[in-house]
Amino acid sequence: WDSNQSILYALLSCISFSILLYFTFLTIYKFISKIQFSSVLLEITGKARLKLWGYIFLCFFILWFPYFIITNPGLAGNDGMHQINELFYQKTFDGYFTLTNHHPLFTTLIQGGLIKLGLILFHSINSGVLINSIFLNILTISCFSFLILTIIDFYGNKLGLLTMMFFGLFPIFPLWANALDKTGYFNAILSLFLVSIINIDGGKRNKSSIALLIISGVLLGLIRNDGLIYILAVLIGSLTLKKKRNILISLASVVFLIVIIGKILVFSTKALPTEPMESLAIPMQQISRVVKYNPSSLTNSEKTTLNKFFHYSNMAKVYNPEFADPAKINSRWPYRQFVGTYKARKEKYDNQNFVKNKKKFLLTWIKIGENNKKLYFEAFVGENLFYIYPQNHPTIYFWMPGTSTNTLFVTKMFKNYKLNRPELFSKLVKNILIATNLPVLNLLFISFTWFFIWLIESLVIINTNKLQYLNLVFLGAAIIIVELLSPLSGYLRYSFPLIELVPILGLICFVKIKN
């Protein structure tokens, strides 16, 4: 990115590789589109169903128990600590954390309640983190067991077993089931949401399926701030369903409930809204690139305007093509300076330039872009390339939860937090890091892989006229859009929902269900 020659080389190599990928894609597609298995729809009910669910739960427990021991009492990374520090208004070196919806308020309250329980019963932050890990493990294993049971219903025991082994052995799922973080909760609830969609698309539209759709959908939207996008995508994709009225009404109700419950939570807890910069990763990156590589194109008026939103003198220095957080942190947003009553905090929030003058920022962004289209395009590509380009870019600590060494988050509440077996966790990290660099195996840890597979599966589903499953295809598209709007390039954590969805789409592609 440092010179026109380098950019030209990068573009030519990208085009060449894209042509190669295109023909590879066509070859793979032509081969796999001819693959078809058949499956008989099973009706497992009563005690037999409960017993089978118990066996699946036990298998997951055995596969995931080593992670529970290694990570005991649980992995508290930056995001999890951030949420708890906000809930308990902890002091740090540059001010005070205050409750916001930056990380979903719903998960902040759940995790905070479990931490509080540990503090009350055992007077220990480690106990609180352990209680969260136990609860999240039980929740995740229960939900994934339900998903496998549903797969067995439609696709048989063998494919159910294979899917279970994938989820059981892929380290991201057990690791995040032991994390003080919203992501583990999202993984669990997404599996329940997938259960409801599989049942509905497969013709099982009884009251329990509709109820599960509504409950899991609402939880999905509350656990992640982008969850609403996923629900809307499924709603649009469900327009192709036959006898869709009840499904569309249910999904519309989910959207309504997410918005209403979210507002109630913010109002009742007196939490501040998410800072506006969270949704401005690409504009911030594009402007920062112009400041670094073509500052002469900016007028004095534009520089003055930018200086009201950012520390202008630092913009070029902190710019990172693949990571938007430095640009966000360089803003003039008064992090950890919102103190006092809710009225005082909200008044200070409303008086920030990114809130009261957001329109002016967006107009300035558009105006600067008119003279810097090339730099804007480069910034967009740099911010998103590794989601749609097959380069080994796993960077393990970018997607794996872990103990934080960041003194900003290690407040008085977390000063005594520690892993019981840090040496075992270090060995685990080292071994996973080795796996992310082994040929073929490393493909599992590259975001592009899951995008590529989703693309093939989606085309097979469309071309074989299985349009009742288009809502799941749209769900995958929404996940990719969220990836492209995220502040990191190739960050595998944003691909977790796609990793969960891809095996389901694979079954839909290649298995014909017989009643």
Task: Please tell me what each predicted stretch does.
Residues Y9-L11, N101, L105-L109, L119-S145:
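Loop-to-helix entry region of an early transmembrane alpha helix in multi-pass inner-membrane enzymes
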Residues S127, I131, I368, E378-V473:
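Membrane-interface anchor segments at the N-terminal boundary of transmembrane helices
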Residues I19, F23, I131-Y155, L192:
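Transmembrane-helix motifs of polytopic, lipid-linked glycan transferases
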